[in-house]
Amino acid sequence: MMNEYGASWWDIPQGKIHSYLDSVHFSYPNKAFFISEFGLCEPNFKGGDQRRLEDLVYHMAIYESKPYVEGAIYFDLTDYRTHYPGTSEKTKFRRRVHGIYDMYGNPKPSKKVLRELSSPVEVQQARQWKKGKLNLLIFGSIGLPQHTVKGYKLYVSAPTENYTSTKAYALPDIIPGERINFEVDDLYNGVGIVTIVRPNGYIVTQKDFSWEEKDQ
């Protein structure tokens, strides 16, 4: 278990993170390798949520390319107040701006990116294949994390609708790497927003398969 802050707290080039992780694994080849922290720690390392988003995508891609990396924890969920002296902000109410939510619980753009990267299920295509029906190509994720999907529900909605007002489809159990073709009603002429939720109601992925001629 180790924290990984390449190109921020660790002043090394991003391209060296790959070889650094390999060197640690080589030293302990029989140990499980878990990333206990990674992320962008503002205000010490400035760049805003755009940098946080880019950092998140880059580091997750590295971890998913390493078969020995068992998991990774993003640091952290929300921004917070701190008295920690290492924080560069000098006001009375110093902040650690580390989160994908601000201190008031408002999501940043990086929140959706982390949610999609962390989903145990991927919806890759929505295709019309027979009258009145839409075929969705779905995979069990083999990235981080990966686990069997049980009791999840799927919704297809228009961009202006709340997905909870539409029909709920029960997904079958899906194991990591498994491919399924899932049939739903084609209510929006081959387009729509596909939302998948856990048994507790939390969204794990939400993808927009709608488009307009001007977008092409």
Where are these regions (language model features)?
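Substrate-binding clefts and catalytic carboxylate motifs of secreted carbohydrate-active enzymes
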Residues: M2-Q216
